[in-house]
């Protein structure tokens, strides 16, 4: 197997081959990282996605930021989420895309900059639609 670094792992968990970086951490090394605090977003898009936001809020899911995105202002008003975004308001006038995926896409593209700002810095984003 040419090109594959050869070596052995010592009692401390580190490899003995020069130039290799250990990929596993022991318990004491893990403790130095502290408690992780990831920024997790759950984005519900459209009517179905917004219904999911309501359910997540109702059952009390914690540790995630909930974001509702919709073209229908009335549905968005009745959605429970930490952040709400009405997209395509100049296209649909807040009346919704009527289940038309092409219209929904146009509205999402119109809100691309705002959506990008919302998800920037997130460690993990779940999208439900």
Q: Where are the model-predicted features located?
A:
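Tubulin/FtsZ superfamily GTPase core signature
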Residues: 1-129
